[in-house]
């Protein structure tokens, strides 16, 4: 049972929630090159150089995207154990494998939407091929755009006639911190989509979707290409 102190929040049972949350984040290239370290009142997300396959991801961009997705799950887990998560990206330049930290900053209650998203995060999500062939309704797409915006990214809807809605997640600028933000936005999109009966397939290789470049604003960089399909009526 967790004690009233923040430092005591990460008992064995609660720490296991963070491990599960990180493990269920999406990854391509069959990479699971991250590891979580639980400290008093803090969870750190590290790159694991032993498991990282540089040949498949030479810039470690996919690694950062996947770790960003794990980071979003960790934030949900923090709310479930009753603490406000405070995230720092790339908190220590002297330790380049330390990609992010989540500090448990004080007691709080999780919101119904967070509890629903957390429950959804514990189920495997489709990651490559969408099921369903209908474009989601515009109000739902707008809700998904808002979910991505709250993570510091933009979801651009691309022109398409029929079938799923093609879109791209973009960030202002590029580099490790932008990749981590895009990963959090991707996981938010996956979970909010699942709650709204929308499947989300994704590719980190945005170059395969040339139309993504046409939708960008000055200074934006496309990070993830997605297809959004309605799965139920």
Locate each region found by the language model.
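Acidic, surface-exposed loops and disordered segments
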Residues: 1-233
């Amino acid at each position: 049972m967790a004690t009233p102190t923040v430092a005591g929040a990460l008992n064995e049972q609660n720490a296991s929630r963070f491990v599960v949350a990180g493990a269920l984040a999406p990854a391509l290239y069959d990479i699971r090159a991250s590891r979580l370290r639980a400290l008093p009142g803090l969870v750190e997300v590290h790159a694991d150089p032993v498991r990282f396959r540089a040949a498949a991801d030479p810039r470690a961009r996919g690694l950062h995207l996947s770790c960003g997705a794990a980071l979003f799950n960790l934030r949900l887990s923090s709310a479930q154990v009753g603490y406000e998560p405070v995230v720092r990206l790339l908190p220590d330049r002297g330790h380049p494998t330390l990609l992010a930290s989540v500090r448990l900053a004080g007691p709080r209650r999780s919101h119904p939407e967070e509890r629903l998203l957390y429950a959804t995060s514990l189920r495997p999500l489709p990651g490559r091929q969408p099921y369903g062939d209908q474009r989601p309704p515009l109000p739902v797409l707008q809700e998904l755009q808002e979910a991505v915006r709250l993570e510091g990214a933009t979801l651009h809807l691309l022109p398409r006639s029929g079938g799923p809605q093609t879109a791209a997640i973009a960030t202002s600028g590029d580099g490790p911190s932008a990749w981590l933000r895009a990963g959090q936005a991707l996981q938010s999109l996956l979970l909010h989509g699942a709650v709204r009966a929308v499947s989300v397939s994704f590719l980190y290789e945005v170059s395969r979707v040339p139309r993504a470049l046409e939708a960008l604003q000055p200074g934006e960089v496309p990070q993830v290409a997605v297809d959004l399909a309605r799965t139920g009526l």
